[in-house]
Design a protein with these regions (language model features):
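Charged, glycine-rich active-site and insertion segments that engage polyanionic ligands
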Residues: 1-54, 58-134
Length: 134
């Protein structure tokens, strides 16, 4: 019961977090993050903002799963992405910062910020936040 937007968003999200996770000290992955940012920046502003909202939901769902609140988890990935393997990386020490950074990025995009720069900056922050210890 997924919309085509959700499927596309999930594909973008999975690619983004996998690349960001590898990017720490990895020059090629940083270049891939910039390319990812350029791709998303080429979409319309409303699509970018909707995608960032989708990311917020995805991170929240992962955290709920991490804290064993399985009955609150409604996200069913359509890709081969395993939420259960991703969940341990989203916890109390990074969820607030992740949500805050996503909201700030959406605000900057809404205020006509350069999407490529906003998304590249967000991607670099994501790399750091994914490696935050629980």
């Amino acid at each position: 019961d997924h919309s085509s937007d959700e499927e596309e968003f999930e594909t973008w999200f999975v690619s983004w977090v996998r690349t960001a996770f590898k990017a720490r000290g990895n020059k090629k992955a940083i270049i891939d993050l910039i390319a990812w940012s350029e791709n998303i920046a080429s979409k319309g502003r409303e699509t970018q903002k909707s995608f960032l909202g989708y990311c917020e939901d995805f991170f929240r769902q992962a955290m709920l799963l991490n804290y064993n609140a399985k009955e609150l988890v409604y996200l069913q990935p359509v890709t081969q992405f395993e939420l259960a393997k991703f969940a341990p990386f989203i916890h109390g020490n990074n969820i607030n910062s992740l949500i805050e950074e996503l909201q700030t990025a959406a605000y900057h995009i809404e205020r006509n910020g350069n999407a490529k720069i906003v998304l590249t900056d967000l991607s670099i922050k994501l790399t750091r936040l994914l490696h935050t210890k629980a």
